[in-house]
Amino acid sequence: VTFGVAKPCHLLPASEAAVGRLTIIDIGLDSADRTAVVERLTADDVAAAWPVPTAASDKYSRGVLGVVAGSAAYPGAGILCVLGALGTGPGMVRYLGPAAVAALVHVHAPEAVTATGRVQAWVLGSGVDPEDTDDEDQVRWIRQALDSDLPCVVDAGGLAFLAPRTAPTLITPHAGELARLLTRLAGPGESEVTREDVLDRPGEHAQAAADALGAVVLLKGATTLVVSPTAHGRPVRSQADAPPWLATAGAGDVLAGILGTLVAAGVDLVDAASVGAFVHGLAADRANPGGPVRALAVARRIPWIVSGVLAGLYTG
């Protein structure tokens, strides 16, 4: 139980596990003129931020997402990323990847387009091995997207190609990936950042990456953090909407697709990361409440979660 408003210790990874069920008692404090340090979105916030089409919308105005994901070693990543994107409600998804993976994508998602063309945002790197040079086209597509002025959601193997860019950039590492990224950005001769370092001080390391790259960082974990560059002056976002069962292979690929659709629709990166994490977590919870959940089941549940959020079925 706390009074007035939630405190940072109630919402941040280092201490949230000890909080249990949080009850906030209103004691009449006026916090309207105070700037939050940490924010957490509710279902009502998510509904307000969600991009809803109108009668005047077409597939291009709703957002066309390009996806460079999946590989011979990890074909499922391409499929799951595309399904996550499609379930979130894009105008179109263009998939670029190995021909064998593209064929599998078409089996699971015949509406996906496997040809180049205009896009409004990219998802890059899910299931891509940066050390595998067999598919030169895929590496070229990732580099070209990062060199463009289009918004990019960069996940997994795509992080190995990332340098500071001026275009909108959202990265989605887990602790190990963030450690490797920070070590690379620091350069030779600097101390290695380890996964344990990130887990001990997640907010600090996410902030370091955000400042170094000029990017929004979604650091995945039991409590997901969304951190923007210090110069932007925005509070940290903290979402803890997913069950522990979501710690499973492919879940991050689905999340990357969700985020890509939101970014292609023009949603602000911090909002896209936060509402995407909320819907991803709730989809996992509702796919099989209280039990194991597959990433594919999460992807298939997304449209129902979105409609439920917009209908006000999940209060708060």
Regions found by a protein language model. Name each.
Residues 5-170, 175, 180-316:
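Small-residue (G/A/S/T)-rich helix-start motifs and N-terminal tracts that mark the onset
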